[in-house]
Amino acid sequence: MQTSDTRALPLLCARSVYKQYSGVNVLKGIDFTLHQGEVHALLGGNGAGKSTLMKIIAGITPADSGTLEIGGNNYARLTPVHAHQLGIYLVPQEPLLFPSLSIKENILFGLAKKQLSMQKMKNLLAALGCQFDLHSLAGSLDVADRQMVEILRGLMRDSRILILDEPTASLTPAETERLFSRLQELLATGVGIVFISHKLPEIRQIADRISVMRDGTIALSGKTSELSTDDIIQAITPAVREKSLSASQKLWLELPGNRPQHAVGTPVLTLENLTGEGFRNVSLTLNAGEILGLAGLVGAGRTELAETLYGLRTLRGGRIMLNGKEINKLSTGERLLRGLVYLPEDRQSSGLNLDASLAWNVCALTHNLRGFWAKTAKDNATLERYRRALNIKFNQPEQAARTLSGSNQQKILIAKCLEASPQALIVDEPTRGVDVSARNDIYQLLRSIAAQNVAVLFISSDMEEIELMADRVYVMHQGEITHSALTGRDINVETIMRVAFGDSQRQEASC
């Protein structure tokens, strides 16, 4: 955050930037400026144009018209290589690392020989408080650490303009604070940061200025200290209000299939002393009709536990009971057929086939149940049902999943999981990287699913989200659940954080 009002020449000045796709205006004369040593936050609803603007600045997508002034020089368009040479680096929401290469190889990949300085890399690692084993494979990192590796790649290229797309989406409050303290050190060197996020408290903490995009325009811009939260939310979307799903949406959302319906409170998924990679001796019960929160810091073992429940990782000990029957030896496909469905944390690498059509993605978990031949008309009808239920925005069923915004991709992934008719639904960071309006849609959706007596295991690093959504909460700390479930008034951010950090003094709540 800037410590002085004295400003040199802007690092970046975008003027009258226009862009359209298939005749649809995505950007309508955008003006955007970034100064040295400042954080300029960029907010906006689903499809507002944020990603398109940043891709133009990073040289990934050309603008139809307009100019970019960088370092006093004007450019009509950039390429990614030219943007890097000018000191621009985009850290994407979904880190683009090579999983089979080491952390060191990923950080240094593509650098010119003159930039291949091991000492510089070590200095950056120390400054950012990173304690990576540089020889470990990047594929072994969690999302938070992959994000840090992407930032390091930019810093190794002497970037002066960093574009951070939802950098804290999968970070805990403690990790977010650590990232922010490192960003402050970067700002002191004159680096400018474009900070894309939907988390208003974090934006108020880190940003000097805020710009809100809506429908391809800048709807609001100003100093953070001069803008109220109501102003910002109203600028994002006038219709953002807490509301239930409409009767029509609920009708379209009725779960398919003929799964037996459990009575509310019936145990659906029971874990007995589970031990696996990243966790040990975990026991809990997930009941029909409830949303059970699973909180904890990144690295606490929550994702590893979820992947083990679904059969993606090897179980080393304990029992998994689904509807009273042990499923330890069942494959992932067999668990799916019995009603256990998993929505993964990383929608792009694990959840969706980005090059496949939207209709194919929504029906991906049920294709084997429909016979050998694809049933395009039926798949399209299924997609249409979820479009109406979840307000998914797309042009045609045949378009590739990668063409959608992050929020709409997440809704497609949720639709895919629901189409499998879950009895127990595990959702890992379901609102990661989605806008304010879509986040509320997902909340209401999960409540509606639980109301149909589905048992929902809700994993999130956002403690406020856990407090808002969960009927009961378990907290993992260093791979273990050391306390009984939080209930009632104990479900609050302060208590959850204390347990997540290993505070053993909390009074135990009744299970």
Curated annotation (Swiss-Prot):
Protein origin, superkingdom: Bacteria
Entry-linked InterPro entries: AAA+_ATPase, ABC_carbohydrate_import_ATPase, ABC_transporter-like_ATP-bd, P-loop_NTPase
Record keywords: ATP-binding, Cell inner membrane, Cell membrane, Membrane, Nucleotide-binding, Repeat, Translocase, Transport
Main location group: membrane
Top EC category: translocase
Residues that, per the record, bind ATP: 44-51
Any one GO cellular component localisation term in the record: plasma membrane
Localization in the cell: Cell inner membrane
Signal peptide: none
Gene3D superfamilies assigned to the protein according to its UniProt record, in alphabetical order: P-loop containing nucleotide triphosphate hydrolases
SUPFAM superfamilies to which the protein is assigned, alphabetical: P-loop containing nucleoside triphosphate hydrolases
Domain ABC transporter positions: 12-240, 264-503
Topological type in the membrane: Peripheral membrane protein
GO MF: ATP binding; ATP hydrolysis activity
Pfam families in alphabetical order: ABC_tran
Keyword Ion transport set for record: no
Record's catalysed reaction(s): ATP + H2O + (2R,4S)-2-methyl-2,3,3,4-tetrahydroxytetrahydrofuran-[AI-2-binding protein]Side 1 = ADP + phosphate + (2R,4S)-2-methyl-2,3,3,4-tetrahydroxytetrahydrofuranSide 2 + [AI-2-binding protein]Side 1
EC number(s) reported in the record: 7.6.2.13
PROSITE patterns, A to Z: ABC_TRANSPORTER_2 (PS50893)
Family assignment from sequence similarity: Belongs to the ABC transporter superfamily. AI-2 autoinducer porter (TC 3.A.1.2.8) family.
PANTHER family linked: AUTOINDUCER 2 IMPORT ATP-BINDING PROTEIN LSRA (PTHR43790:SF2), CARBOHYDRATE TRANSPORT ATP-BINDING PROTEIN MG119-RELATED (PTHR43790)
Subunit structure: The complex is composed of two ATP-binding proteins (LsrA), two transmembrane proteins (LsrC and LsrD) and a solute-binding protein (LsrB).
Record function comment: Part of the ABC transporter complex LsrABCD involved in autoinducer 2 (AI-2) import. Responsible for energy coupling to the transport system.
Protein name, per record: Autoinducer 2 import ATP-binding protein LsrA
Protein species of origin: Shigella flexneri
Annotated gene: lsrA
